[in-house]
């Protein structure tokens, strides 16, 4: 017995070292993010409301009748109101800002901070994310911090995946017992009793093999993690690790990236039904893929909403309203690959020269480029219209054209 205890103790120390090393370092590789030049707006600048609106739409802002939340804007007769998002610019972090830009004679006549009621001389919109430099076949994720995650997301996650998350110490014996009885009844492994912590262990450290030995290791590691780290640290790791879809040959991991993949917006701008849809995907990202199987995704979302209602996170009226909503997805254009290939080839070449260490290029680096998205849109529109006119004038189709923006 003493030898057995010594072996278990030694193995526990070994697992603890593995866990500590993983949590102390960079748990994940995060692709470099390539941004265009941010739109700069200043007094007396010659620009139209339409041009600003085009930029806002490119950035995934939503046009509303009253702009009250981050990522929203409203167009008035001679002005535009914008809830400019918080962003880490190259010159430093700028917080959420509620502004109104007024126009006179096709120029900006005033920029006002609506919270302070003070006029300002200029402001940046956050830059457009052109692409993410993901290696072929790799995981992609956009890391989030627990303090930036909407509380309703963690509440929904716990309600659906692990209702006793805040009470247990990494394993839930009753859940394991229920799963064990189901497996014995079926004569094979058909059900798991994993907590969120065990799911995190499985994703970070283990294979998907279903065996008692692996399950025992999973439970031991879950207990160690619970002793070493707070519930918030565990939740944050889970939110960034979980698999939520496939973008071509690249895996979509974590809620931060999934928010853009399915809705083209940051996580803190999603509605409750959209958050419930993402939580529902966890059970089977392929089976509940809302693009390929919208009805399945809808039914699964409503199960999540039901769990939230039963956990007193939603009122009866909120629940009834939310389950009637259809699933509406964005195009996922913000993560579309192959945008501006010639420009991106040049960016990659310069990055290899400046940053020869590939690990640095996979550390979540933000790269701010000179690409002017506003000029690019004008150029593309001019070329498209010009080619169409020439084809109509000559009576032939299939013309090609090129333009250089300097």
Regions found by a protein language model. Give the residues of each.
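C-terminal soluble interaction/assembly domains
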Residues: 399-406
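Juxtamembrane regions of bacterial inner-membrane/periplasmic proteins
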Residues: 1-394, 403
